[in-house]
Amino acid sequence: MRHSLPYRMLRKRPMKLSTTVILMVSAVLFSVLLVVHLIYFSQISDMTRDGLANKALAVARTLADSPEIRQGLQKKPQESGIQAIAEAVRKRNDLLFIVVTDMHSLRYSHPEAQRIGQPFKGDDILKALNGEENVAINRGFLAQALRVFTPIYDENHKQIGVVAIGLELSRVTQQINDSRWSIIWSVLFGMLVGLIGTCILVNVLKKILFGLEPYEISTLFEQRQAMLQSIKEGVVAVDDRGEVTLINDAAQELLNYRKSQDDEKLSTLSHSWSQVVDVSEVLRDGTPRRDEEITIKDRLLLINTVPVRSNGVIIGAISTFRDKTEVRKLMQRLDGLVNYADALRERSHEFMNKLHVILGLLHLKSYKQLEDYILKTANNYQEEIGSLLGKIKSPVIAGFLISKINRATDLGHTLILNSESQLPDSGSEDQVATLITTLGNLIENALEALGPEPGGEISVTLHYRHGWLHCEVNDDGPGIAPDKIDHIFDKGVSTKGSERGVGLALVKQQVENLGGSIAVESEPGIFTQFFVQIPWDGERSNR
């Protein structure tokens, strides 16, 4: 069916870049050259006519200054000898006529000798008879002509006659037409040069644009924009100077940046971005930076930065990042639930074993031993599990602590929840996730500090009061060296060797993001104690 054809097949394809550029440049060149031709042709007509008139005037002035002409005017026309001189000059300069008259307009020379002695035809001689040079177009006996007139003076500067020279008008027109054709050929040559230059320009543009047509570039741009705006990861691109050139919607949301804000410009973003993400090494050495955890405006972002190369030259860098905070919180909450389930599973196996013991004692009818065993089991449960569940109202935190108690037991150590501990459930997932992160790091650090030698003890105290949770984690391990304790929360600082020192920095960051605080005390060889204080919505959750 026709309507099922792809849209691209139904859409009319635009003209190619070469065709578009050639047509546009040709139209511009033709318009410009046409205007130049019209203006120049108008000027060249006047210039040609004026040039011929000036040439004729020069000849006329030369004759007017000739002594032979002056002397000849003192005689009768047939006896003056002026005819021979005038004809020689006329033929030499290819003129239509040279007529010398006296002050009565009687001819002393003419191409047709029989007209000598007759009056000059035309009133355009009158100005010359009054002492003024004159240029006019008029028809005489010979043809329509461009005629110039100049007065003749004697030695006393008294006018004694006039020299009239005629140029055939068809000759003037022919010279103008010759000039016009030279202009036309110049215009055509200019068009040809312009088209050749346009073809060269098109080839250069095609190379710059990788052989793509404009509509293909616009399609690629639209596809790129749609792709950038559809992905959830933030994307920020910079040029070789570190200036931000591209930012997608996800990045704007993660960075709380909006292009529409008048007070926010890409240059401002470039400055703040360079302070957060150091792209100088990537731009300089081309070394990618992968899986960096960076906090931007209370968000924990996982950033990857890679160089952008063109012909082997680094021309910029692209950073992609995503919000790791939400993922981490969900993983921590899930981890707490998994720990809770593992703890229940372990306890179910343990109680199954106890039931088998009880069943065996019943078969043996050892009722006294059975009574003692049941009482002991109940007391142990109350001390270990029942007491913990009574103090810790959050199932996630309770399951998490039970799993850590079992882990400490498996490692040969003891994890104790202080008897004065009291923790209501919180209505904030952020607070629960932060507490799990904090307790998890501090307890694991304590277990590692205690080492493989059994017998170590870890104490956890959780105390809630007036919207604040106070947490203490104490161990009797080797402690922290004095030269490291002041920097223990710095990223990369660890008592456990290289490639460590991230956990406590993350704990401090998340605690402070909630508005809380964390501190440490340690006596080498005796104890280490961490103090944590975070807001806790315990009262809201119990309403």
Swiss-Prot record:
A cellular-component GO term for this protein: plasma membrane
The protein's location, in the record's own words, is: Cell inner membrane
Q: Does the keyword Disulfide bond apply?
A: no
What GO biological process terms does the UniProt entry carry, in alphabetical order?
regulation of DNA-templated transcription
- Tell me where it mainly resides: membrane
Q: Where is the PAS domain?
A: 212-323
Chemical reaction(s) catalysed? ATP + protein L-histidine = ADP + protein N-phospho-L-histidine
Bilayer-crossing residues are 21-41, 182-202
Q: What class of enzyme is it?
A: transferase
Q: How does it sit in the membrane?
A: Multi-pass membrane protein
Report whether Ligase shows up as a keyword of the record.
no
Modified positions (Phosphohistidine) are: H349
User: GO MF annotations for this entry?
Assistant: ATP binding; phosphorelay sensor kinase activity
Give the UniProt keywords, A-Z. Answer: ATP-binding, Cell inner membrane, Cell membrane, Kinase, Membrane, Nucleotide-binding, Phosphoprotein, Transferase, Transmembrane, Transmembrane helix, Two-component regulatory system
Q: How is it modified after translation?
A: Autophosphorylated. The phosphoryl group is rapidly transferred to DcuR.
* Membrane topology, Cytoplasmic segments: 1-20, 203-543
SMART domains in the cross-refs:
HATPase_c, PAS
Q: Name one Pfam family in it.
A: SPOB_a
Domain Histidine kinase intervals: 346-538
What this chain does, per the entry, is described as:
Member of the two-component regulatory system DcuR/DcuS. Involved in the C4-dicarboxylate-stimulated regulation of the genes encoding the anaerobic fumarate respiratory system (frdABCD; nuoAN; dcuB; sdhCDAB; etc.). Weakly regulates the aerobic C4-dicarboxylate transporter dctA. Activates DcuR by phosphorylation.
Quote the record's domain comment.
The periplasmic domain is involved in C4-dicarboxylate binding and sensing. The structural disorder in the cytoplasmic PAS domain has an important role in signal transduction to the kinase domain and may be the decisive structural feature that characterizes the activated kinase.
Which named protein is this? Sensor histidine kinase DcuS
Organism in which the protein naturally occurs: Escherichia coli O6:H1 (strain CFT073 / ATCC 700928 / UPEC)
Encoded by which gene? dcuS
